[in-house]
Every structure is written in C-alpha cells, then in structure tokens.
C-alpha cells in the first residue's frame, strides 16, 4: 500500500532493528508496484530476467545481478513472462548504522548517504569488480537476519559495514546527482 506520493506505508523491521529481509518472485503478480521509501534496499536476482525501474532509469536485469535502491528512489520490478524473476531483498534504515558526530564512518559515509549527497551504483553484475565479495556479504546479511541466532544484531551491523567497505573499495559509492534529486522531489509532491 502506498500514499499519494507513492511512498510505501508499511514499515520494515522494528524501531530497535530497522531491517527486513524478503524472498519473493513475480510468478503470480508479474510486477512489483512502483513505490519509494526512506530505507535503502538491496535486491539480488536469484533467477529469471526482467526490468527494474529506478526513478527515470529502466534497467534490464538477470540472474546474478545485485540492484541497489538508494533511499527515496522510486522503484518497481517487472518480470519477463517467459523467464519469471525470483529474488531476495534486504530493506534497511541507514540509522541502524549511524554513529555519533565525529565518528569517521558517520561523517564520511553514512551521513552523505542519508543526506543524498552520495549514492550507491544502481546495479552490480557478475562481471563487475569485487562482485564476489559483495554478493557473499549480501548473502551473509540475508542469512544472518533470517536465522536470528543469539546476538545476531551485532553480526548484522558488522556485516553491513563490511558490505559498505567492499562497495567503497569497488568505487560503487559516488557523489549524488543533485539536480536529478531536486527534479524527482518535485515529482513526488505532485
């Protein structure tokens, strides 16, 4: 369910642990409606192929692709009917990783992402550098959250920081396009 601006109304996780993991497919409903939320989302394509919308950009995706949906980005998925999409996703609030003022991780990475001054590359494919490390961490985060072993929340935070480290090392976090963000903000107000 979404509001008039297409903002998703459902919450992901809890106040204490604002993370949720999903395993989904487009078998019955051939698309995932266009929506946006304040949380980031990581989507790993298990099998199949289709299209992913990220704001005004349409990406063709296939098995093995990792899609990164930055916070506030309008997004949706549509499957190829002959090759149904199956995917896993992680939706998380960047506040989960926040640190105090002066903390280097907070100042140089998290704050920039939270304020839309930096963003993740939208898609990482098997042929891209650092792909294996990044996808192994996606899998570890998804599994850790699903299994919920004792003190899993500590491990989750460590895994997310490792994920961010690998993204930085692969140059997959870049300065944001401020003009694009302004025009999209006006679209959401309509």
Please place each PLM-identified region on the residue numbering.
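A hydrophobic/aromatic-rich effector-binding and dimerization subdomain
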Residues: 1-20, 78-143
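Generic protein-terminus/edge-of-domain signal
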Residues: 1-62, 66, 73, 106-108, ...
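Residues immediately flanking
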Residues: 47, 71, 92-94
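Residue-level recognition of conserved beta-strand edge/terminus positions
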Residues: 70-72, 78
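Short, Lys/Arg-enriched, Trp-marked, Pro/Gly-tolerant hinge/linker segments that flank
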Residues: 120-130, 145-190
């Amino acid at each position: 369910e979404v509001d008039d601006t297409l903002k998703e109304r459902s919450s992901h996780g809890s106040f204490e642990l604002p993370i949720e993991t999903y395993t989904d497919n487009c078998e019955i409903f051939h698309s995932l409606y266009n929506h946006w939320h304040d949380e980031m989302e990581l989507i790993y394509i298990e099998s199949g192929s289709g299209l992913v919308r990220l704001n005004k950009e349409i990406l063709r995706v296939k098995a093995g692709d990792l899609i990164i949906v930055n916070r506030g980005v309008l997004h949706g998925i549509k499957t190829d009917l002959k090759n149904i999409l199956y995917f896993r996703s992680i939706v998380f609030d960047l506040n989960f990783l926040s640190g105090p003022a002066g903390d280097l991780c907070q100042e140089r990475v998290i704050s920039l992402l939270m304020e839309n001054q930096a963003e993740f590359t939208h898609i990482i494919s098997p042929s891209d550098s650092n792909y294996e490390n990044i996808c192994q961490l996606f899998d570890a985060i998804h599994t850790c959250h699903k299994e919920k072993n004792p003190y899993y929340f500590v491990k989750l935070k460590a895994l997310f920081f490792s994920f961010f480290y690998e993204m930085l090392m692969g140059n997959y976090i870049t300065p944001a396009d401020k003009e694009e963000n302004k025009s999209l903000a006006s679209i959401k107000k309509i």
